[in-house]
């Protein structure tokens, strides 16, 4: 599961992993034999307990979120696991470069897994969900394990239409707090 999450978050897993390991060693968070240092453990504890702030600009999607959130297999799981009935659509955000890098720290959070299912003979894949807030409004950042979005695009679901509730249009800047 962690490998799949890493791939979705970072793109090329081997290149990204090698770069990340080198930067962790330089920062004295890992030893040369890849053991987590005391400083590394302190950082992990901070990452687990604090919300992650991601910033970017609202962008239009292709409407696929509306389709997937109309499927009862996903709707039921969102109600049961996230505690809200999702608006049938997603808010797409193009992350700034710093937030795109910070997105990889989601691997330290425990995702809520929306399990894949079969409906009308078609297979739908797993989705990782992370509770979030956008300008104080309840939401969840969702990461389908099969997606066509590049790593710098995130999708948010909510019990309300986020564009309307927050009066957002393409190009507006938003901050997403992921818990």
UniProtKB/Swiss-Prot annotation:
Which residues are FMN-binding?
147, 155
Q: Which cofactor does it need?
A: Mg(2+)
Q: Which gene encodes it?
A: ribK
Q: Which GO terms describe its molecular function?
A: magnesium ion binding; nucleotide binding; riboflavin kinase activity
Organism in which the protein naturally occurs: Ignicoccus hospitalis (strain KIN4/I / DSM 18386 / JCM 14125)
Function, please? Catalyzes the CTP-dependent phosphorylation of riboflavin (vitamin B2) to form flavin mononucleotide (FMN).
User: What InterPro entries does the database record attribute to this sequence?
Assistant: RibK_CTP-dep, Riboflavin_kinase_archaeal, Riboflavin_kinase_CTP-dep, Riboflavin_kinase_dom_sf
Q: Which family does it belong to?
A: Belongs to the archaeal riboflavin kinase family.
What's the EC number here?
2.7.1.161
Q: What's a GO biological-process term for it?
A: FMN biosynthetic process
What does the note under cofactor report?
Binds 1 Mg(2+) ion per subunit.
Catalysed reactions, semicolon-separated = riboflavin + CTP = CDP + FMN + H(+)
Supply the name of the protein: Riboflavin kinase
What's in the keyword line of the UniProt record?
A: Flavoprotein, FMN, Kinase, Magnesium, Metal-binding, Nucleotide-binding, Transferase
Pfam hit, one:
CTP-dep_RFKase
Q: Which residues bind CDP?
A: 61-66, 160-163
Query: What pathway is this protein a component of?
Result: Cofactor biosynthesis; FMN biosynthesis; FMN from riboflavin (CTP route): step 1/1
Q: Where does Mg(2+) bind?
A: 90, 92
